Amino acid sequence: ERMIVIPTMNTNHEKCDPLLKLIQDLDDTHIIATVHYYGEWVFSANLGITGFDEAIDDDGKTARTAADSAMETVYKTFTQNDIGVVIGEYGVLGYDQGEKCNQPGEELKYYEYVNELARKYGLCLMFWDNGSGIDRVSGKYEWKKPQVGEMLWASMEGRSSYAAELDTLYFGEEAEEDVLVALTLNGNTFTEIEGLTEGEEYSYDESTATVTLSKDYINKMYAESSREGRFGELVFTFSSGADWTEKLVRFKTPEFKEASGTT
């Protein structure tokens, strides 16, 4: 039989208690609750906080700890009281803007972790797509952001691994030393960097879960690039979960110069 879904006020996870009372008073096992979750506003819409683990306030709150609090609240209010929950929409508010808004790797960490919390607390997730996620025009039904699609599919089954820092390494000149990339494994093991030779172009320290990229390899790639922008993409693979792509970017510091005209 079909279930009736009732939302909290404004589908807000902070307004759970009134809905709990309503559902309990109705005493109907065919009623479930729903909330929507788009993460912390300043992270989700990139209002100055780009990192999933970047402090939002002086208390050390992050987008990750905010997700912890939100999902725990929903679980303790509804699930522990035998009321099913559907997260009827989740995502990030800046998704429509492509990579212009949310930092891609940090967005992936968000999806990975929200799925982990949903498994932990027995919640059902529904990814909100208003046309920005899946191509429905060509008939191919492919993800417009393939890495998002891969992460979402993988995260429904288990955890994925990623770099502890950003998914981008910036170089304003040739590297003077090897480059370290610390990994957050989440229970998996590192396998390889696709197309590279371990022991020559990179090495891996299992005890610290750190990949070391050879400066000779970096500088070779850097020298082959003739202009600012992305000059390499390194695909890290693991024993389970989605792959992780680390981008190599060549940049030049902007310079202020004289200009003329009207404003």
What is each model feature region?
Residues 97-194, 227-245, 254-258, 262:
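Aromatic-rich peripheral "rim/lid" segments of glycoside hydrolase catalytic domains that contact
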Residues 215-231:
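Surface-exposed, short loops/turns at beta-strand junctions within beta-sandwich domains
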Residues 198-214:
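Extracellular/luminal ectodomains and secreted, surface-exposed scaffolds of diverse proteins
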Residues 47-64, 97-99:
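Surface-exposed cleft-lining segments at the edges of enzyme active sites
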Residues 14-16, 43-45, 135, 193, ...:
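Short acidic, gly/pro-rich beta-turn/loop elements at beta-sheet edges
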Residues 1-50, 54-56, 73-92, 121:
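Active-site region of glycoside hydrolase catalytic domains
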Residues 63-124:
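Catalytic-core region of carbohydrate-active enzymes that cleave or remodel glycosidic bonds
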